Amino acid sequence: TGSIGRLCLATNSTLHLIEPLGFEISDSRVKRAGLDYWKYLQLIRHKSIEIFLDSLPTDASTVFFSTKAKKPLYAKEFKKGSYLIFGCETKGLGDELIEKFSKDTFKIPQYDDRVRSLNLANAASIVVYEAIRQLGH
């Protein structure tokens, strides 16, 4: 989460975290990890994915990412203000979400089947900078 927090700050993005978290974010943990930028991060925590999705504007552009998706990341035309949604590091997005939002779910291409998935922070970086590239920044 430290790497993703840094990514969000560097790209002026808001980090939304969905509970339950698989890690602790406390002032002491943040200080111990040397995350001196954390206090500047736009961070919003949500009790569940349902609460998060319900909190979005009705016209929000939501884009989901999963290794189980059929369409590659590069098939997506990003819009300014898109919400980029990833699953947890160990399990990814749940099958129910992938099925419900299949038309808005994409994958980062991988070319070796021995790799189950990319590290979450790496995946987020790839997607965020592809969106920025497409938007002409």
Regions inferred by a protein language model and the residue ranges of each:
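Post-transcriptional modification and biogenesis factors for structured RNAs
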Residues: 1-137
